[in-house]
Amino acid sequence: MRNAMNETWMAGKWFDPRAAVLICVLLMVAIAATQSACAAQAETAPLRVAIVGLEHGHVEGFLHALPAHKDVELVGIADADPALWKKYGVKFALPDTLFYKSMANMIERCHPQAILVYTPISEHRHAIEIAAQYGLPVMVEKPLTISVEDALAIRNVAREHHIEVLVNYETTWYASNREAYNEVKQGELGAIRRVVVHDGHQGPKEIGVPPEFLGWLTDPAQNGAGALYDFGCYGVDLMTWLMHGETPLTVTAVTNHDKPEIYPRVDDDATIVLTYPHAQAVIQASWNWPFSRKDMEVYGATGYAITVGADQVRVRREHDAAERLMTAPPLNKPEDDSLDYLAAVLSGKIEPKGDLSALDTNVIVMQILDAARESARTGRTVRLTRVGE
């Protein structure tokens, strides 16, 4: 007998339990190492993104920035216009194999992990609905869509298919806006009393946007409105963020057609006034500014913060003898860039709820813009109640 060796007779051979334990341990270590390696590979693998639509001029900014994002891989582009394939293919040395006429075909062949939409605003809902069928998250250019009806439909499909829908605004990545927000959050300005936002430029035709962009930008059926939507959305988004998603009590808007010979179908200047129980916002959106601008003034009960460009703020607090100009602290990664932010949301590092890009914020933005359009049309103030959750 080999009791001293703790051996057992099995299947006609001697079997050592200690060897079995060792083998099990080694297998567990190997499996853990494999899983760790796979997780690390997934963590470092580039995010596979696809573009839908080339009619939006902002797609050029994305393609310019793409080479700096080694953690992002463009795997496909869907657009029905071969002339735009050629335009961007030549300009950015993109291979012909990237381009598809059908969004669904592109998704099935390229297997992206996220969709970036650069279509006319009116097509956002359709693109999101297709992406949802494949369980793919979507980032669209501002604003979310052209009506509150579409916004609610997008929210429903996002919930049904458990996908993220984000909205990209240039001003989200301004350190100056974050610093103004932090001044309020930290109590340096007291309770918000008044916010004034200015956004716009000399006009899309005046600054030379490409014809495929200008065509839909000046069509109310495709853009929702003119300057009212194109630039009013920035201030509405910022105010909704500052107010932590509170719906205003009333929306009043007036629009002008100062250049009807250039923009006969849409407004080129708009002012939106939002009232809250203890605060007011005045949003001035225009295609008639003498220069491009995106700035915000936040006035509290005891101080103010006025943004200057993307990274400076003029601040005066309660006991300051005069205002001071400060450089806003740089935004921390991944909240300093749309693609980094998208990747962080998809990996679970960021919960977007309440953010400038978040769907819940932008459903409220669309409710306000829709009401502003109606107010401008009728000449009456529109009273709001929060849309159902």
Regions found by a protein language model. Give the residues of each.
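Bacterial N-terminal signal peptides
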Residues: A20-T34
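N-terminal Rossmann-like dinucleotide-binding module
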Residues: C38-F92
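C-terminal helix-rich "cap/oligomerization" subdomain common to oxidoreductases
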Residues: Q41-E43, A114-L116, A344-E389
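Predominantly a Rossmann-like dinucleotide-binding segment in NAD(P)-dependent oxidoreductases
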Residues: A45, G57, T172-I262, G379
